[in-house]
């Protein structure tokens, strides 16, 4: 974009520009509402809530990926503490609907209502995205797996069968959400219809309507409205290739109130090659030039530039690196890319993900394994990583930068800068004249150190800044936002080359926090005051003060930590380096999401500050501490005592409204050793004398499939979903008669999704496995009977155990799972007498509704409940107390189980993860070369919290949260180990403490209701 002529012609006075700009824009951009309420409005610039403009900075988490309702508060408090104004969630139709006509919004984490009440209590706006399709790398994209049979049509269209199937969920979830809308004194501000569904047009250029897609979207909107949803309806387009659902483009059926677009400029997966068709060649930090400005100008010119999903990280696919791919998605990514969005005048952002969580059970799509850490700012084990803090220094700023919610982009050029390697975008509020200059490398992959000055336009004329001090520095993959005419309380910052972090008005005086990395220079000018002094006694100041007639300029070289400058009128300027800014908290004394600067205390030092409350003269703070920490608190002078996590602290100093104290100590916790393992066979089904007559078994009798990919006609339908079986490991048991000229082989064609595998037995003899790969979804293979003994006088029994990785996303949700073709091969003509399939306990009528419907598969150990607390493991064999390994001799499946007590002291947040390893004589190469060919499942108190495929997926650490773990009681740990080789398998299981924090959060909550135990009915599924 060309730089504004106003700037090029000498940077004319801001005052004259402001008047013209305001006049033009007041007539150009209409203010919209949805015709039902004006509580939430919007225009070209931003959203308005209750008449006040907001820069909406949000982030996503999924309650169904952390199935402990008590921990949702922990996450929301961490989101609030960082300065986010909002958060977003997907709901999950499949999680709430185990079978047609059945909905569960009550059991355990299925009851998500507390999230909405917490949003109100804590003070966060909420964007809710109920689907019915959500993608999210969830199994079938969040659709119920009973819809994947083909019986409901192609899905996500106006097929009456599909609409009838989704209506109970859609109507009920709308009713549940409606009382929590902002129109009903709740905090839900936006309601999303569908997800990344760019299906309004058959032809984008001619706007030939896609009637099916339009009617589908309109149906969802109508049902939502009929059931109480009167908040604005939104939609997120998947990329900038489509132009659907915008009222600015057409009045076509299905339009939503506000349209947005999702963006993953690096890649949505750690395997960046998968994004080449959308993003082009991957070059780290290059994709900053997405044409958001021109795209929004075409798509939604009278609506805010809105990104319902912007890259908060990437998922780790099967075969991806251990621990994910945080390197190119770390603090530098957050610093550079999120400021770049601001430079493009985006005023509503939601990071995907802010907390990723865990694909426990079979929640994952076929693309990913157990971890959904996503390299998010809040890690899978709930730890705040450096990326969180680097994001926080921006979200704290956008929350108090009220003028940022209405800006025009006047230019973007290297001509603002004295250094041609540095580009600057100018944003200016047309009403107030406040401006924001976003600086970054002209060639964004560059990580060089660049120094420069910037030409700015201020209310006091054109300036080149800094005026006195050393030049501004960009060091590496960094961006800086330089403000001019920035309001903080009643004061105005004429300019600052140090970034604004936050401010508060305390006792009628402003406290402004600025930050710049250690060793770099900063300079600021405050209007309306003409003197300043360095207020840190005992510390050497590297600071210059330049008084003016009606302002004062301070130039400084940033030292390590925090310093304080006092202006002549009592205004205080806090100078912070990056590390100090990371732990500098702006904590409101109320729960108003819009609170910006008033009713706030500032706290420097702790790992986390969750809340602040002023009761009389007692200041009560809550939060978390990693170790002994020096803390400074900017609070009213009336404060007479400070309580931290309910305990009165010893105040070292309380001068000038700054209270200093020391908090915490070195908290420690040691885990007991995991021992006392017992073991039993978990594949009795291969034995010839096994009777497949329990309630676990269904006889395959269906001859015609509803799936668009029909199976071979020589057998009944063997797709698991058409037999009411949906997730996990599946067991087929087929019989065929003995003959004089018996078959010599069996041909199998099986589809199970990426990373799936299967093993085959004949008459108890192992005849082979398909080990699987990270990318292969289907395999056909012929297995010889040469290693098995065929029966001469009775039926032969063929057993196939398959690992159903998951259902695919989008249109691929209909891809079948199970056996497409099973054919006996030999000199004669053969057919199977009967096929049976083992289902999970209860099939679609789950015996364990708290953990259902995506937790359990069909292994014997799961069906009878060996993985559950309270199971009497009478058939078990003791594992040697000297053994550090769990072993399976030969090919087969065994279950290992033990019970380990925990006793975590009150006041500690102890994060625990399990580590599974499988020794081999090679590293991660190929399945064939890996000598420990196994698949294992980790169960903790009944929850499947780890899928371990060492030769395919490289995840070895599996965090398990409190609530799933009993922190003050016995914990049932079970591991099923499936050896896919005659050589047998060996696995090692251990656990580790990831971190220990002193916390105000009650981790000793009663989570027993989340861990229901074994019931007698399980025996019926043996």
Curated annotation (Swiss-Prot):
What are the GO BP annotations of this UniProt entry? polysaccharide catabolic process
Uppermost EC category: hydrolase
The positions annotated for binding substrate are 90, 135-137, 195, 264, 374
Residues annotated as the enzyme's active site: 196 (proton donor), 309 (nucleophile)
> By its UniProt entry, which InterPro entries does this protein fall under?
Betagal_dom2 (IPR018954), Betagal_dom2_sf (IPR037110), BetaGal_dom3 (IPR025972), BetaGal_dom3_sf (IPR036833), BetaGal_jelly_roll_dom (IPR025300), Galactose-bd-like_sf (IPR008979), Gly_Hdrlase_35_cat (IPR031330), Glycoside_Hdrlase_35 (IPR001944)
> Per the record, what are the reactions this protein catalyses?
Hydrolysis of terminal non-reducing beta-D-galactose residues in beta-D-galactosides
Which residues carry a glycan? 25, 111, 172, 210, 251, 271, 412, 457, 551, 598, 627, 704, 749, 787, 821, 882, 921
What is the residue range of the signal peptide feature? 1-22
Q: Sum up the protein's function in the record's words.
A: Cleaves beta-linked terminal galactosyl residues from gangliosides, glycoproteins, and glycosaminoglycans.
Matching entries from PANTHER family are given as:
BETA-GALACTOSIDASE RELATED (PTHR23421)
> Protein name, please?
Probable beta-galactosidase B
* Native organism taxonomy: Eukaryota, Fungi, Dikarya, Ascomycota, Pezizomycotina
Gene name tied to this protein: lacB
């Amino acid at each position: 974009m060309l730089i504004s002529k106003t700037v090029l012609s000498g940077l004319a006075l801001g005052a004259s520009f402001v008047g013209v700009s305001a006049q033009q824009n007041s007539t150009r951009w209409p203010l919209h509402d949805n015709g039902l309420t004006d509580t939430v409005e919007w225009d070209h610039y931003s959203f308005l809530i209750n008449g006040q403009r907001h820069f909406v900075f949000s982030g996503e988490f999924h309650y169904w990926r952390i199935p402990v309702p008590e921990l949702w508060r922990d996450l929301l408090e961490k989101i609030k503490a960082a300065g986010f104004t909002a958060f977003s969630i997907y709901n999950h139709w499949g999680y709430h609907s185990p079978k047609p006509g059945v909905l569960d919004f009550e059991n355990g984490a299925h009851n998500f209502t507390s999230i909405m009440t917490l949003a109100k209590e804590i003070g966060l706006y909420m964007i809710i995205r109920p689907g019915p399709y959500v993608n999210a790398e969830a199994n079938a994209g969040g659709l119920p797996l009973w819809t994947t049979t083909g019986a409901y049509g192609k899905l996500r269209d106006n097929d009456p069968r599909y609409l009838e199937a989704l209506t109970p969920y859609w109507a009920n979830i709308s009713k549940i959400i409606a009382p929590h809308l902002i129109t009903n004194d709740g905090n839900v501000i936006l309601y999303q219809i569908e997800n990344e569904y760019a299906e309004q047009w058959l032809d984008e250029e001619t706007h030939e309507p896609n009637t099916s897609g339009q009617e589908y979207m309109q149906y969802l909107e109508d049902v939502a409205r009929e059931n109480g949803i009167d908040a604005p309806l939104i939609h997120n387009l998947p990329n900038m290739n489509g132009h659907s659902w915008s009222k600015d483009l057409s009045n076509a059926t299905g339009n939503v109130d506000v349209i947005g677009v999702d963006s993953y400029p690096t890649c949505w997966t750690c395997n960046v090659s998968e994004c080449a068709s959308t993003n082009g060649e991957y070059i780290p930090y290059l994709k900053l030039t997405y044409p958001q400005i021109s795209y929004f100008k075409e798509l939604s010119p009278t609506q805010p530039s809105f990104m319902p999903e912007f890259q908060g990280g990437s998922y780790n696919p099967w075969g991806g690196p251990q621990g994910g791919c945080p390197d190119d998605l770390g603090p530098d990514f957050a610093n550079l890319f999120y400021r770049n969005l601001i430079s493009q005048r985006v005023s509503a952002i939601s990071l995907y993900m802010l907390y990723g969580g865990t694909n426990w059970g079979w929640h994952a799509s076929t693309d990913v394994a157990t971890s959904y850490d996503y390299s998010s700012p809040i890690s899978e084990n709930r730890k705040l990583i450096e990326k969180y803090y680097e994001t926080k220094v921006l979200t704290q700023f956008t929350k108090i930068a009220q003028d940022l919610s209405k800006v025009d982009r006047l230019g973007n050029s290297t001509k603002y800068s004295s250094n041609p390697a540095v580009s600057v975008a100018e944003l200016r509020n047309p009403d107030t004249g406040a401006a924001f200059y976003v600086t970054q490398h002209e060639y964004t992959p560059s990580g060089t150190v660049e120094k420069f000055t910037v030409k700015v336009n201020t209310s006091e004329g054109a300036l080149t800044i800094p005026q006195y001090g050393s030049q501004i520095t960009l060091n590496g993959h960094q961006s800086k936002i330089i403000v001019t005419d920035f309001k903080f309380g009643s004061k105005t910052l004429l300019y600052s080359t140090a970034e604004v972090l936050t401010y508060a008005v305390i006792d009628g005086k402003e406290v402004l926090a600025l930050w710049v990395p250690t060793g770099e220079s900063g300079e600021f000018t405050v209007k309306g005051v003409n003197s300043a002094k360095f207020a840190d006694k005992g510390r050497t100041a590297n600071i210059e003060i330049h008084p003016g007639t009606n302002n004062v300029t301070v130039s400084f070289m940033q030292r390590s930590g925090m310093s304080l400058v006092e202006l002549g009128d009592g205004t205080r300027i806090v100078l912070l380096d990056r590390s100090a800014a990371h732990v500098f908290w702006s904590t409101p004394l109320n729960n108003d999401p819009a609170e910006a600067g008033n009713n706030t205390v500032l706290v420097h030092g702790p790992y986390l500050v969750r809340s602040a409350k002023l009761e009389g003269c007692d200041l009560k703070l809550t939060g978390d501490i990693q170790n002994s920490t020096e803390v400074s608190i900017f609070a009213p002078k009336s404060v007479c005592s400070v309580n931290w996590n309910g305990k009165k602290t010893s105040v070292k100093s309380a001068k000038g409204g700054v209270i200093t104290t020391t908090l915490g100590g070195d908290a420690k916790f040691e885990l007991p050793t995991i021992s006392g393992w017992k073991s039993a066979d978990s594949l009795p089904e291969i034995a010839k004398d096994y009777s497949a007559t329990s309630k676990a078994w269904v006889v395959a009798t269906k001859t015609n499939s509803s799936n668009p990919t029909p199976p071979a006609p020589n057998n009944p339908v063997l797709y698991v979903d058409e037999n009411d079986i949906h997730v996990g490991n599946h067991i087929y048991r087929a019989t065929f008669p003995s003959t004089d000229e018996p078959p010599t082989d069996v041909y199998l064609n099986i589809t199970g999704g990426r990373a799936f595998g299967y093993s085959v037995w004949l008459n108890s003899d192992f005849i082979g496995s398909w080990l699987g790969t990270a990318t292969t979804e289907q395999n056909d293979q012929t297995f010889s009977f040469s290693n098995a003994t065929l029966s001469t006088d009775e039926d032969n029994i063929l057993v196939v155990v398959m690992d159903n990785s998951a259902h695919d996303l989008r249109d691929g949700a209909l891809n079948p799972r199970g056996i497409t073709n099973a054919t006996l091969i030999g000199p004669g003509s053969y057919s199977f007498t009967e096929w049976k399939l083992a289902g999970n306990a209860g099939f679609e009528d789950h015996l364990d509704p708290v953990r259902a419907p995506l937790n359990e598969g069909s292994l014997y150990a799961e069906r009878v409940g060996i993985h559950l607390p309270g199971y009497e493991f009478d058939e078990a064999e003791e594992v040697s107390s000297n053994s550090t390994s769990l072993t399976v001799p030969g090919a087969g499946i065994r279950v290992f189980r033990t019970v380990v007590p925990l006793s975590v002291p009150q006041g500690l947040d102890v994060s625990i993860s399990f580590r599974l390893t499988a020794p081999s004589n090679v590293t991660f190469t190929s399945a064939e070369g890996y000598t420990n060919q196994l698949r294992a499942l980790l169960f903790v108190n009944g929850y499947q919290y780890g899928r371990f495929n060492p030769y395919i997926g490289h995840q070895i650490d599996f965090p398990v949260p409190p609530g799933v773990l009993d922190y003050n009681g016995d914990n049932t740990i079970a591991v099923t180990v499936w050896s896919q080789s005659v050589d047998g398998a060996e696995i090692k299981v251990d656990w580790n403490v990831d971190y220990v924090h002193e916390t105000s959060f009650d981790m000793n909550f009663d989570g027993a209701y989340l861990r229901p135990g074994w019931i007698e009915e399980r025996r019926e599924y043996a």
